[in-house]
């Protein structure tokens, strides 16, 4: 792989790392809301939506980590 492509992929990795930080921040904030939800509201539709959001954000974070891994392997 030539230098120009490697540099472009390093740049892409930086953007993905920033995206990963944003996704993780949102996931941690949403999980904090779940953890602080009163017990009487834990059966609510909103609570279930928050749990689903956390699960989806966790999947997104895993996918971003996987993308970083494959980019790193490609640049080697």
Model-assigned labels for residue ranges:
Residues 1-76:
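Long, low-complexity or tandemly repetitive, helically biased scaffold regions used
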């Amino acid at each position: 792989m030539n230098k120009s492509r490697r540099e472009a992929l390093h740049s892409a990795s930086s953007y993905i790392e920033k995206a990963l930080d944003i996704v993780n921040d949102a996931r941690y904030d949403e999980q904090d809301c779940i953890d602080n939800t009163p017990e009487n509201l834990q059966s609510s539709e909103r609570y279930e939506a928050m749990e689903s959001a956390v699960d989806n954000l966790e999947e997104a974070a895993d996918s971003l980590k996987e993308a970083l891994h494959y980019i790193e392997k490609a640049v080697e």
